[in-house]
């Protein structure tokens, strides 16, 4: 957009020697000479004063444009990082005119003038620009030191300080003159609803992406909206700023800390707790498998195995966990078969009759022994031909599968399962039924969002990249399931269930108000990107999810 004062016939070249300031200095020097001559009586004092006044007039005429040009060229040197206190930040955001805006910092709008200035800069040699910028920075550092009283009291320390500042100026990264082509830096606001289409933030290492994240996170917290922060590298500053923002609102209890590198301080979180259909669980796990050429049969078989176990657990009204899946993938299938068939008998016959049938079928044979399992299978296939379950049929097919072949087909799956279901991650990601009853220690993503919590998730990928990436992918998939429920059900209740699996599904669905905007911040997104994450980016807007990547 062209400015109101833009003149297409006016040409300005600001990146040149400052002739105006030089002229002003010459005119002022000449005026001093005339004043000196007037003082010593070299010529007529009146004439000398008139000449001095003329020289001063010319000097002041050139001084203003010279100073403006000096200031403009000085901006090419860049500026030190600016900071704002949380109190001042809240006052800034409290402006009624920007109640529905997002503050993105200070800067200027690009117009024809700025584009022309940048074009002229690009036409110059970059080394020349760097030399000019460093030289100008030296002059400014020297002027600042001269103004300070302690410079004259401690000249040696002042010289050391000068050398240190000059060295820092030479080490600055990037191209600071890009930000210097604008005239004035003012507060820049973006309509908040523009963020509904998600926001991509990119820049080189150390360019300030994470600190910009801090600004956006603090604003989301101050708006009282739920915030999910996924931080693969575990930035302490990001966690601290989020915690301080909660403290400023007197909502310290709303801050939830999850970090796989600090299990002693972390809450427990089950990344398989939210789903609308049980096969989503298998899809989350199989998404972690390597997608190499020729791996499709192994991936498909692994998906089928996980899905079968998850369906069986759900039929038993047991919440699927990573350790539960690991337990039955490694063996103990007899135990799962007995649990599943017992649950099915109770659903079809009632508690009392099912217990009586179990006693008749098993007698004194242990239920989990090979003979006991065989007896239950025979009864199921012979006596319950009209009341069979697809879940049990799939489970029996897997149970009777050749164990050697089964182990080979899930070779790529087991390392992934071991990564996220052993050691300290076992308790963090697979809480027991007892732990899940502890609402302080165990938290659920749907409950966290419903309570508008601020959830910091540190993945510690610097220590173990593969484990951190796997955990991050699972958590993002869990978030995608929460968002997906907003598409399917919105604020309404789930349709009446038709069987026990549907009933259990209803109990796992989020029951928060989907009109609430959920802010998801994913730093270093390449570490955790997967198919559910792409789906969340593609369709999350309809569920009021805002992603900042």
Per-segment meaning from a language model:
Residues 1-229, 233-252, 315, 346, ...:
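Accessory regions of macromolecular translocation/handling assemblies
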Residues 180-183, 192-195, 202-205, 211-545:
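P-loop NTPase motor domains
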């Amino acid at each position: 957009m062209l400015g109101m004062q833009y003149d297409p016939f006016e040409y300005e070249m600001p990146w040149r020697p400052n002739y105006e300031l030089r002229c002003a200095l010459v005119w002022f020097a000449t005026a001093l000479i005339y004043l000196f001559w007037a003082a010593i009586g070299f010529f007529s004092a009146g004439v000398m004063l008139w000449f001095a006044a003329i020289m001063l007039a010319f000097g002041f005429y050139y001084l203003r444009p010279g100073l403006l040009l000096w200031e403009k060229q000085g901006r090419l040197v860049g500026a030190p990082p600016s900071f704002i206190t949380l109190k001042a930040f809240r006052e800034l955001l409290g402006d009624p005119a920007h109640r529905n805006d997002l503050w993105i910092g200070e800067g200027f709008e690009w117009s024809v003038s700025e584009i022309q200035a940048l074009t002229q800069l690009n036409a110059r040699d970059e080394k020349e620009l760097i030399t000019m910028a460093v030289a100008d920075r030296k002059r400014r550092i020297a002027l600042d030191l001269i103004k300070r009283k302690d410079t004259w009291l401690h000249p040696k320390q002042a010289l050391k300080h000068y050398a240190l500042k000059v060295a820092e100026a030479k080490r600055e990264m990037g191209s600071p003159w890009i930000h210097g082509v604008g005239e004035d830096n003012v507060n820049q606001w973006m309509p908040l609803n523009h963020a509904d289409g998600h926001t991509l933030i990119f820049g080189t290492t150390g360019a300030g992406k994470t600190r910009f994240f801090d600004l956006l996170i603090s604003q989301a917290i101050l708006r009282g909206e739920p915030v999910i922060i996924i931080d693969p590298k575990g930035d302490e500053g990001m966690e601290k700023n989020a915690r301080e923002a909660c403290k400023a609102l007197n909502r310290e209890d709303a801050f939830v800390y999850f970090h796989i590198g600090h299990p002693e301080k972390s809450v427990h979180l089950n990344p398989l707790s939210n789903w609308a259909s049980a096969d989503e669980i298998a899809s989350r796990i199989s998404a972690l498998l390597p997608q190499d050429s020729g791996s499709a049969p192994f991936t498909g078989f692994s998906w089928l195995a996980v899905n079968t176990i998850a369906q069986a657990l759900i039929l038993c009204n047991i919440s699927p966990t990573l350790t539960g899946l690991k337990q039955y993938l490694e063996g103990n299938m007899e135990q799962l078969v007995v649990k599943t068939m017992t649950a099915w008998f109770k659903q079809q016959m009632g508690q009392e009759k099912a217990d009586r049938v179990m006693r008749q079928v098993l007698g004194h044979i242990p239920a989990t022994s090979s003979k006991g399992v065989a007896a239950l299978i025979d009864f199921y296939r012979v006596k319950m031909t009209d009341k069979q379950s697809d879940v049990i049929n799939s489970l029996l097919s897997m149970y009777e599968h050749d164990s050697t072949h089964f182990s080979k087909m899930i070779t790529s799956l087991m390392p992934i399962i071991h990564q996220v279901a052993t050691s300290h991650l076992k308790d963090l990601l697979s809480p027991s039924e007892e732990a899940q009853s502890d609402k302080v220690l165990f938290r659920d993503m749907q409950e966290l969002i419903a309570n508008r919590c601020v959830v910091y998730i540190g993945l510690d990928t610097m220590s173990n990249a593969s484990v951190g990436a796997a955990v991050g992918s699972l958590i993002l998939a869990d978030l995608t399931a929460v968002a997906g429920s907003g598409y399917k059900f919105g604020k309404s209740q789930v349709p009446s269930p038709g069987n026990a699996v549907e009933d259990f599904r209803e109990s796992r669905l989020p029951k928060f108000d989907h009109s609430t905007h959920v802010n998801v911040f994913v730093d270093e997104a390449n570490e955790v990107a997967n198919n559910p994450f792409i789906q969340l980016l593609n369709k999350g807007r309809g569920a009021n999810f805002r992603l900042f990547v």
